[in-house]
């Protein structure tokens, strides 16, 4: 794995936690999962135990085991492994942070506590500071996802002076559609070399224009190769091609969102595309329906994200 001083950038897959039909974690497929990301999708950074990974539906012991398996199987294959250690309990977050440091993770990330919520920036920073202090040598990232936490403190406000209080702070995962807030995060911190990792996959191109240095998302598990084509087009200033790639990705995301799209459906799609059994989600989430999977498969094929050999009517809307 990379030096902890290396800036996290580029595509980062928000990993899925594979489970058996009985809801137990299926550790046996994580090695295959690593190889699939690297060899088939070209994605070499991962964000473990986050929203997509059902981290907050796992026990502390399970989260530690999942983190260990990713670090072990990703050794000499993945560039960076960031572990999400957020929890409602400060002590549990600190325990998870210490564990991440002990096993050789490349960084940690934390969401805001979302039951008894911090009511202003200073309270939230105090919480984050205590977690970061449990693993001071690890790069620390704030995971901003207000739609799920209900914590509406603007990221721009949070970043003001944060490195003075949290020396290991290195950036944030910004999972919100407020591009004004995101843009101001970048604009007001240009000299600080923070990692600005955007977390809304269907809006990534807009974030790149505003200065995103990378992206963390669930679709990079199975659309990583396509998204990398967009990044490469953007880097060579072929903005027309980059836009076409983004529109293509949006066609799929827009389609599945209308069907009902979340962690359960992500597991079903990843199973379909990779051939690696991701299993059902843990309660209270419900397994994706067969109808959803069939519709998603047809859409993936029509967009040329899967082999189209089974399509009788031809590939009418494939993205080049």
Swiss-Prot record:
* UniProt cross-references to InterPro entries, sorted A to Z: Aldolase_TIM, DapA-like, NanA
**Which reactions fall under this protein's catalytic activity?**
aceneuramate = aldehydo-N-acetyl-D-mannosamine + pyruvate
- Cite the active-site annotation: 143, 173
Keywords of the record: Carbohydrate metabolism, Cytoplasm, Lyase, Schiff base
Query: What CDD domains does this protein's entry cite?
Result: NAL
Which BP terms does GO give this entry?
A: carbohydrate metabolic process; N-acetylneuraminate catabolic process
EC numbers for this chain: 4.1.3.3
Q: Where in the cell is it found?
A: Cytoplasm
Molecular-function GO term, any one: N-acetylneuraminate lyase activity
Q: Which SUPFAM superfamilies does the record cross-reference, listed alphabetically?
A: Aldolase
Principal EC category: lyase
List the GO terms this entry assigns under cellular component, sorted alphabetically.
Answer: cytoplasm
What is a single Pfam family found in this protein's UniProt entry?
DHDPS
Source organism superkingdom: Eukaryota
What pathway is it annotated to? Amino-sugar metabolism; N-acetylneuraminate degradation
Q: Which SMART domains match?
A: DHDPS
Q: Where does aceneuramate bind?
A: 51-52, 175, 199, 201-202, 218
Disulphides: none
Briefly state the protein's biological role: Catalyzes the cleavage of N-acetylneuraminic acid (sialic acid) to form pyruvate and N-acetylmannosamine via a Schiff base intermediate. It prevents sialic acids from being recycled and returning to the cell surface. Involved in the N-glycolylneuraminic acid (Neu5Gc) degradation pathway.
**Family per record:** Belongs to the DapA family. NanA subfamily.
The entry describes its oligomerization and partners as: Homotetramer.
- Provide the protein name: N-acetylneuraminate lyase
Q: Which organism is it from?
A: Bos taurus
Provide the taxonomic classification: Eukaryota, Metazoa, Chordata, Craniata, Vertebrata
């Amino acid at each position: 794995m990379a030096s902890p001083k290396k800036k996290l950038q580029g595509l980062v897959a928000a990993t899925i936690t594979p489970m058996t039909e009985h809801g137990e974690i299926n550790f046996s497929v994580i090695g295959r999962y690593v190889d699939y990301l690297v060899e088939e999708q070209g994605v070499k950074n991962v964000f473990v135990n986050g929203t997509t990974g059902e981290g907050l539906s796992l026990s502390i012991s399970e989260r530690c085991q999942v983190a260990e398996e990713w670090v072990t199987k990703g050794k000499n294959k993945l560039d960076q492994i960031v572990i999400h250690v957020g929890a409602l309990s400060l002590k549990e977050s600190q325990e998870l942070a210490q564990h991440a440091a002990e096993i050789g993770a490349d960084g940690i990330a934390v969401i805001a506590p979302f039951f008894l919520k911090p009511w202003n920036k200073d309270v939230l920073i105090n919480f984050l500071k205590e977690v970061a202090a449990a693993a001071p040598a690890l790069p620390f990232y704030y995971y901003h996802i207000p739609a799920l936490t209900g914590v509406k403190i603007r990221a721009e406000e949070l970043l003001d002076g944060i490195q003075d209080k949290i020396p290991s702070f290195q950036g944030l995962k910004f999972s919100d559609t407020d591009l004004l807030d995101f843009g101001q995060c970048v604009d007001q911190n240009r000299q600080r070399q923070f990692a600005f990792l955007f977390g809304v996959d269907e809006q990534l191109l807009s974030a790149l224009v505003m200065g995103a240095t990378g992206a963390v998302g669930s679709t990079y598990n199975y659309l990583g190769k396509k998204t990398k084509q967009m990044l490469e087009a953007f880097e060579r200033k072929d903005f027309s091609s980059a836009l076409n790639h983004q529109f293509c990705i949006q066609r799929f995301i827009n389609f599945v969102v209308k069907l009902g799209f979340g962690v359960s459906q992500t597991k079903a799609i990843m199973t379909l595309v990779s051939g690696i059994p991701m299993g059902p989600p843990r309660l209270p989430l419900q397994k994706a329906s067969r109808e959803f999977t069939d519709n998603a498969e047809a859409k993936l094929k029509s967009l040329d994200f899967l082999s189209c050999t089974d399509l009788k009517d031809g590939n009418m809307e494939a993205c080049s």
